[in-house]
Every structure is written in structure tokens, then in C-alpha cells.
Amino acid sequence: MTSSQDRDATRNGKSHLCALLLLAAMTGSTSPALAAGGDVAVVVRPETPVDNLSLSEVRKLFLGDRQFWTGSLRVTLLIRAPTSHERDVVLKTIYRMSEPQFRQYWISKVFRAEASSGPKIVYSNSMATELVLAIPGSVAFVDATEVPKGLRVVKIEGTLPGDPAYPLK
């Protein structure tokens, strides 16, 4: 190969790489499995006193009906920003609400002094997991493939992400 052919091959390789990165950015994912949207895990700190919740218990928790884990350990809800797969799953499966209904629910709940604030909005799975690690009592929904060491995945109806019966897909 001549040096001119080497340069052309390098340019073509870079062009292909740029095209792949652009495609990944447009789909919002670098993995076909993530682009399709996989299981969503409920994560807490290891010392949070919960291992397994029924779907109705998760619903009560994220509706703000349960504000303490035990004693004085307050529940801090962390939820992904609109348009994320995790938020879509949570709104459909847990809240059973549309985006406008969700916003109105929390405005009403805070206005009636039934909650001091709504869930905290997080903009990525990594932001959610970092905050769960930093805030005692916090709980979040994240892509099950992105759970870091140091967090515990809560079983839902006795199942974990990846199980065919797992409800948060």
C-alpha cells in the first residue's frame, strides 16, 4: 500500500466511525439493546431497609403515600426527566398517568401539603445512581444494565430485572 492509499483508508475508517457515532447520538444509545429499552431497576443504598416490594407498594412509595422507610429515614424520590425510557416505564406501569397528569398530581399533592415536594428530577442514569449513593433513603429507577457496584436492586414481586416475570419493562 502506498502512503496515499494509507491516508485514504484512514479517512474512510474515520468516516465510518463518525457515521456510527452520529447514528448512536441520533438514537440516544450506543447499544441496540439500550435503544430498544430494557428492564428498569429500582435501586437503593445497601443500608436502606427494603429487599422486595409488591408493585402496589412501589406505587404507594412513588406516589408519595409512604414518606419514611423506617423511623426517621425519609424517602427521597428520584425520577428521570421526561422523554427517557425509564420515566416512560414508571409513568405507564407505576403511576398509570400521562406526563401532564403526573405533573398535576404532584402540584396538587404539594399544594394540599400532603408532600413537601415532588420527586427530584435527574437527567441521566449515572446522575440517578450517584445521588442514590449520596442521599440516605433515596430511591430511583435506572436502566438495569447501568446499576453500579454499591447499590442494591430491589426485587419487585419477588423478581429481579432480566426475569421474564419482571414487571418494569
What are these regions (language model features)?
Residues 1-13:
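N-terminal secretory signal peptides that target proteins for export/translocation
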Residues 16-29:
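Bacterial N-terminal signal peptides
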Residues 10-13, 33-38:
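Extreme N-terminus of proteins, especially the signal/transit-peptide cleavage junction
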Residues 35-169:
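Exported/periplasmic ABC-transporter solute-binding proteins
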